[in-house]
Design a protein with these regions (language model features):
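Core catalytic alpha/beta fold that binds nucleotide/phospho-ligands
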Residues: 1-197
Length: 197
């Protein structure tokens, strides 16, 4: 039996995220089931978790109004649960990216390219990981992952926060997306993106 040792917990209204230790090379779903089961009132093996054709986790009857997701990186696992939303969660390790400017220029939306490449290197690195993590979380919520295209929508800073500024029609209006992001220690960024059902 897998046990869930919770290292952190965050909540925003009907959305919750748990942080757990995670062994590299193992699946996150068994631990996700352990942490979700007591909250959802079912045994871990009874949780109706299935995968969409693109691999996105989803809850079935009788929990259709809830949504789940998880992400792992560098010994950490985040498990997210929300009610009345479609959500995505991402966790990224902050590490040097020698070709960061090339990645931005090649894959990001033109507005993000202009903004990020106009920053000093230290600021660019900080914002790059925040934007990357936010983009992954949003695309996990959407259900297509990064194959959808990182260039098809944009985040922009609003003070010290990020918000969707440009949205491809397939993603819905930019204003329909919400984002929470935070640091986990000095080496990781986390993001939770969601859209109301």
């Amino acid at each position: 039996m897998v046990t869930a040792t919770v290292l952190g917990h965050w909540q925003w209204g009907h959305l919750q995220v748990w942080q757990l230790p995670h062994t590299a090379g193992t699946r996150g779903e068994p631990q996700a089931r352990q942490v979700l089961a007591p909250v959802l009132g079912l045994a871990p093996e009874q949780l109706p978790i299935s995968r969409s054709e693109r691999g996105r986790p989803q809850l079935g009857r009788p929990l259709e109004g809830q949504d789940v997701g998880w992400s792992h990186s560098g010994g950490h696992l985040l498990v997210a649960l929300g009610q009345g939303v479609r959500l995505g969660v991402d966790l990224e390790r902050i590490q040097p990216r020698p070709r960061m400017a090339e990645v931005i220029a090649r894959f990001f939306h033109p507005d993000e390219v202009a903004w990020l490449l106009g920053l000093e290197e230290a600021a660019r690195q900080q914002w790059f990981f925040r934007v990357w993590c936010a983009k992954e979380a949003l695309l996990k919520a959407h259900g297509h992952g990064i194959s959808f295209g990182l260039h098809r929508f944009a985040f922009a800073p609003q003070g010290q926060c990020l918000q969707v500024s440009v949205s491809d029609p397939e993603l819905g209006p930019a204003g329909s997306w919400q984002l929470r992001e935070w640091a986990i220690g000095a080496d990781f960024r986390a993001a939770l993106a969601w859209q109301p059902l």
